[in-house]
Amino acid sequence: MTDVNPVRSDNCRQYNNVPPQIDLPAMDHEIIDLWARQHTFDKSLEATKDGQPWTFFEGPPTANGQPGTHHVEARVFKDIFPRFKTMQGFRVDRKAGWDCHGLPVELAVEKELGFSGKPDIEKYGVEPFNAKCRESVTRHVDAFSELTERMGYWVNMDEAYWTMSPSYVESVWWGLKRIWDKGLLGEDHRVAPYCPRCGTTLSDHELAQGYQDDRDPSIYVRFPVTSGPLAGRAKLLVWTTTPWTLVSNTAVAVHPEVRYVVAHRDPVPEGSDAVATASAEDPASQDLIIAEPLFEKVLGEGWSLTGESFLGSQMELWTYERPYNFLEWPKTERVTVDGRPTPADANFVVLADYVTVEDGTGLVHQAPAFGADDLQTCRRYGLPLVNPIRPDGTFEESVPLVGGQFFKTADKPLCEDLDRRGVLFRLEMHWHSYPHCWRCDTHLIYYAQPSWYIRTTKVKEQLLAQNEVTTWYPETIKHGRFGDWLENNIDWAVSRSRYWGTPLPLWRNDDDRSDVICVESLAELSQYVGRDLTGMDPHRPFIDEVTFTRDGHTYHRVPEVADAWLDSGSMPFAQWGYPHVPGSKEKFESHYPGDFICEAIDQTRGWFYTMMAVGTLVFDESSYRNVLCLGHILAEDGRKMSKHLGNILLPIPLMDSHGADALRWFMAADGSPWSARRVGDETIQETVRKVLLTYWNTVSFQVLYARANGWSPAQGTQHDADPARGFGGVVPPAVGSRGFGGVVPPAVTERHVLDRWLVSATNVLVRDVTEALNNFDTQRVGNLIAQFVDELSNWYVRRSRRRFWDGDEGALWTLHETLETLTKLMAPMVPFITERVWQDLFVTTNPHGPESVHLASWPVADDSLIDESLSESMDLARRIVELGRGARAEAKAKIRQPLSRALISGAALAKLDEDLQAEIRSELNVMALDSFTAAGDLVDHCAKGNFRALGKKYAKATPKVAAAIAAADPEWLASELAIKGSVEMDVPEVEGGKAVVTADDVIVSERPREGWSVVNEQGETVALDLEITPELARAGQAREVIRFVQDSRKKAGLDVSDRITLAWSASADLATAIEEHAEQISQEVLAVQMSREPRADDWAVEPDLGLAVKVVKV
């Protein structure tokens, strides 16, 4: 391969040699080196520094391991649109970023150190542990940086933001202070999802990312009523899917407006095999209280209603016997409910509107330590919060039966005990979706403890309003997945009881827990402390040691760190160190809000949410305007990639096999961006074959024939804004001529019909691709370009091959201009191969033009060069050619065998001028193109009965009706059915003697008349006259000779322009054909001399043709 950085001088006019084959992975590395030597990315930023800003926000990856193929997906899209906008002249500052804090990093370090949880970290020490976390981040960044360069993702790595940098942490503090000042940040004792392995709460958007299907017990238990009208003779039938929480049962909730009934078990008849549940009990004690709508569903047969019923509101404050007395219930201050004091410290019926009658029994077990609704309800009744579960998820050792057991494993022994004591009424196992930690896979527990919350519910309407002015791709996300999330928004549990994260900037008065000070910077903290802290590391444990005294009271920092999602959600301003770092105000204000963000679809409940939430909370405006959601990456068989299945494909080996462009094109163009993608070697290779290699082969073709003819384009290919001279656009900087050496390209209006068609098609492509990219629709871009490349190669180039061979200026100029435009259009999606082409075709021939395709201007469509009429006529011509090929295939007539004529409908022929008719004649290899009036003139019809349809109408008479159809004139029958839709036929066996036959009752087939091959499709017909005259036969033989000689040239390794002498030996018939067409053969194969000679042993032989030749280069 030639030098990728050619010497650029005015004497460098010729294309570089472009080989027909290309090693895409090897090319990648050459182009990466070229960009590095020429500082191409930096130059693209410099060239557009005064352009209109177009802001792209990089969602920071967590550098805690090796990057996967899914990381390539997001980076492809995050590279395409900034490249596109840069070529349009926008200033796109592409700042990289790294998400450094949080559980992902901590868990990776714990694994490296062999730790099993927080106690190990505390023993090891927070300072050395956080140092390990910092080192882990910097170590894994190298792997992501390698991927970024290898795939051609242009992003500013040198000035990347790090969420662990002190300036970034201070910016997050500043944002929290704004939220604090608005009264939207505070501490509360709530039930929140909690990971016992990681020892910290999770936010609602983290919770949504970790649901898995689990098989758990669903149990019905009986609580004896101890007060009220049913005391001592009925039991509350309570349903729960968390048996382990029954140890902490505090109340039973009912709906105030639901009617509850008393059900009695029917006596078991003597001699019956039926076994009653808990049959040892007194029958009277079997009375169960259940919601009336659920009686049949839960109890049903074998149970009867006693006639007693109560509204839920009437059952309020009834006491009952709890299932376990393992714990000591704390004494609480009794409250008054509707003028009545609560009857006990715990275990009585309470009212709750959230109780439903869709599942369960209508009576809901309450354990306020483990349920947000439970906690809210029980607080209203002054009930205690009883929690025997330790932070590691195990029961306290003092709890009988389950002490020391993990909460999920305690279900089994508790259910067995309930059954043994007659408390269990029914146990069923069911599958349901249960939350797990999205990072470590541990079962989560809803756990009551104090946490810091951002009150996002207070800005719900603002968030919904911001969503309305945001453009989502796909649009369904706006009011679907994301809109639903906002509608059901709950407060953000922002604190984490961990170590490696942004410390919460909150200092609490040791003597008054309600007295809390929020600081926005180290500078402000310095004022409280009385010494300069601006140079310190704001992480734990250093920041924990900072205390200060105010009004005689000592303040210590609260121990929690912030949710890492707060870090990433703050990046629009924190990446600049806003507002503390000098110059950050200008940078932030010129880049906010962002024009474009892009990540996988699960970020609707992650980064997309926190970015909108933080922007709205801090600035009253969302952080972004347009967001593209991406589908997930799957293995080739449709399964999720996992180490367990052994189907993980690492991105760099994929690119080393197929090239970065192949993977990029596949990600961008193979399906809509938001659809899941099946990635595999075969699917990627198909991309290479269908698009990239076809594009490359077309480039190689242009170079081959341009060099063979000594042709070179002018100094600039878009020479004139005059539409008659080319695509329009850039006027070259050179003065005195429109072309290199004074060469002026032929006017478009003066070019061949194929050239004019291609100029029009290229401008249409520019228009459509630009529109699609402006709408972030890479699938449409891919389809448009793939179709264009196919038409360029398989229609324009093939039909123009003779003109290229002859050095036709119009053809060479047109393909040169087309390839220049096409290369620009493809550059954002496949930057490597387009750069290779740019260097070999356009840098070498235009020393004053852009030195990289990525420094070139985006093409603009010239509407004056779009010829819709010509496009329609060319489409018709191509359809006729396809039909003609089909007719040849049906008749098994080789394309090299000339035929006398092809017939098409007169209406179609009238739409084709002589130029296009000539193209059709040449492509179909026919001597003449004529018209016919009706396709029926070329075929014979055959008709027979459709027995399936006839049988439904005529039953036993069907054979007689079918016989009548077969006896009818098929031409008449086909015509009548086509015109009238039905035909009445004489059939005595049918009632009334007449059978009405419709088109469904008849199978009409067409058979071309002898000597013709006819193909009809969508109202267009092509008929080929198959008669082969002796003259046509010899012409066909001559073409076979040309084909064999050309093959012999290739096998001899000759260049396309090499002249030869041709010695030949053939049978008498073939010799006549060769001699008759000698001039044509010699021109096609570049033979300066042809001679008939006796065959020698070293000659090439074609036995089927009866031909032997010897090719010698002159």
Swiss-Prot record:
This is Isoleucine--tRNA ligase. PANTHER family: ISOLEUCINE--TRNA LIGASE, CYTOPLASMIC, SOLEUCYL-TRNA SYNTHETASE. HAMAP family: Ile_tRNA_synth_type2. It is found in: Cytoplasm. Its EC number is 6.1.1.5. A motif ('HIGH' region) lies at residues 61-71. SUPFAM superfamilies: Anticodon-binding domain of a subclass of class I aminoacyl-tRNA synthetases, Nucleotidylyl transferase, ValRS/IleRS/LeuRS editing domain. GO terms for biological process: isoleucyl-tRNA aminoacylation.
